[in-house]
Amino acid sequence: MITISDKLINGTVAAQLTASLMAVSCITVTFCVNLTMVQDKANGTRKDFNVAPVSKEKIYLGYFLSTVANSLMVNGLAFVLCLGYLLKMGWYMNAADVLWVLFDMILLVLFGSTLSSIISFPLTTQGQLSAVGTIVSAGYGFLCGAYMPISNFGPGLQKALSYLPSTYATSLIKNHMLHGVFREMERKNYPDEMVEAIRDTLDCNPVF
C-alpha cells in the first residue's frame, strides 16, 4: 500500500496551479500591456510620434521593449506571490528550479511580446482592441493547456494543439515547477509507473 503525505499532495497541486497561472499570465499580461500601441492609434497620440524625427522602426522597438519591461515587472511580482503560496502549501523546489522558472518566464514574455506585436500591428480602433483583449484573456488558457491539461482532450484536439508553440511553453514551465515534486516522489521510491502517469496527466511529457 502506497501512502502519500498531505504535504506532497498539496505541493503537487500548488505547483501545477502556479505553473498554469504563470504560463497564462506571461502571455495575457503582455497582450494587455502591448494594446497601448493600439490605444495610441485610436486616440491620436501616434500622430505626435509620426511627426517626430524618429524612425518607425525605433517607435515599434520602443513599444516592444516597454511591453517586455512592464510585463516582466508584473509577472515577476506574480512569481514572488506564487513562491509564497508554494512555501505555504508544500515547498520542493531548489535554487536551480527557481532559476529555470525565471528563465521560462522571460522566454514566455518575449514570446508573448512578439506575438502581441504582430497581432496588434494592424489594429486601429477601440472595438478591435476590446475584442482581441477579450479573446486572448478568455481563450489562451485553454489553448495552451493551462486551464485543463491537454491530455484530457480528445485525440483530434490534442493533435491540433500540438502544433502551437504555447503548448510546449506551458509544458516547459510545468516541468520546472514540478521538478522538485517528482524528485521527492522518486526519493520515496514511488513506482515509476505512477510517477510517469502523473507526468503524462499534467502534460509534463508533451507527446500527442
Predicted feature residues:
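Short amphipathic alpha-helical coupling elements at transmembrane boundaries
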Residues: 43-51, 124, 159-162, 175
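Alpha-helical transmembrane segments and their short interhelical loops
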Residues: 56, 67-140
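Transmembrane helix boundary and interhelical loop/hinge segments in multi-pass membrane proteins
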Residues: 30-54
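Residue-level recognition of transmembrane alpha-helices
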Residues: 21, 40, 49, 63-64, ...
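Transmembrane helix segments
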Residues: 120-171
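Short hydrophobic, aromatic-rich alpha-helical segments embedded in or entering the lipid bilayer
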Residues: 150-204
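Short hydrophobic alpha-helical segments within the ABC transporter permease transmembrane module
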Residues: 45-46, 59-68
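Long, hydrophobic alpha-helical segments
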Residues: 2, 14-36
